[in-house]
A protein has these predicted regions:
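Fe(II)/2-oxoglutarate oxygenase catalytic core
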Residues: 2-184, 188-226
Length: 226
């Protein structure tokens, strides 16, 4: 009987090893996504001087209680190694961003609670998508709470001294931004009550080699649009 227990334990450990260290992170995160993807042109826009030094100081000062980052609801440090905190809608930071979006003609979109992300030396986030998969039970719950993440703006509050770029893996495009710059892209759009996803929106945070990188995630949702 003990032999069967040992064999079963060995199989469990072996499968766990395969999942954690052999399968590429892209498979772990995205193989489940069997959705219709858009073949439309995908573009990433650079927003120069998106934030000034004073605005950045306010945002960083409101960032407290950082915790280890999660992938949806899972702690997967081999996929995402960083710390995050949320900035609620009653903060000065949120009002700064809301005003900027209104001036950009994006007032129809709801904005999720802002997320500050800190990457220390060795910090990274493997290739991933920002949109919620409506065919995934867990992500569907987030979709019902926050709406779909139609667009993303990612701003650099503090660039790393070396490394720490943002790479769009499907189009092999790397952005190495300066303080105050941001990048802006579409994650998906909707046709006849069906979300069409931009497969080329997959992106990753490249490892920080020196210094610290601090970024701001701004997700624009369709919560009140339909």
């Amino acid at each position: 009987m003990y032999l069967y227990v040992y064999i079963l334990l060995f199989l469990v450990i072996f499968l766990l090893f395969i999942f954690l260290f052999i399968l590429p992170p892209d498979f772990i995160l995205n193989e489940k996504r069997k959705m219709i993807h858009s073949k439309c042109l995908f573009d990433v826009k650079l927003l120069d001087n998106f934030l000034n030094d004073e605005e950045i100081d306010i945002i960083i000062s409101e960032g407290v209680n950082f915790e280890a980052s999660y992938v949806t609801e899972l702690y997967l440090p081999f996929v995402r190694n960083s710390k995050t905190c949320q900035l609620l809608k009653n903060t000065k930071s949120y009002q700064i961003i809301r005003n900027k979006l209104n001036k950009m003609g994006l007032s129809k979109y709801e904005v999720e609670d802002l997320q500050i992300t800190k990457y220390g030396v060795g910090g990274f986030y493997h290739g991933h998508y920002d949109y919620f998969d409506e065919d995934d039970m867990v992500e569907r719950r987030y979709l019902s709470m926050t709406g779909q993440r139609m667009k993303t703006i990612f701003a650099y509050l503090k660039p790393a001294d070396k490394g720490g770029g943002t790479k769009f893996t499907k189009i092999n495009k790397l952005f190495q931004l300066k303080k105050g710059q941001a990048i802006y892209w579409d994650n998906c759009y909707k046709v006849n009550d069906k979300y069409i996803y931009h497969v080329n929106s997959q992106h990753e945070a490249m490892p920080v080699l020196e210094g610290e990188k601090i970024g701001l995630n701004i997700w624009l949702s369709d919560k009140y649009m339909y």
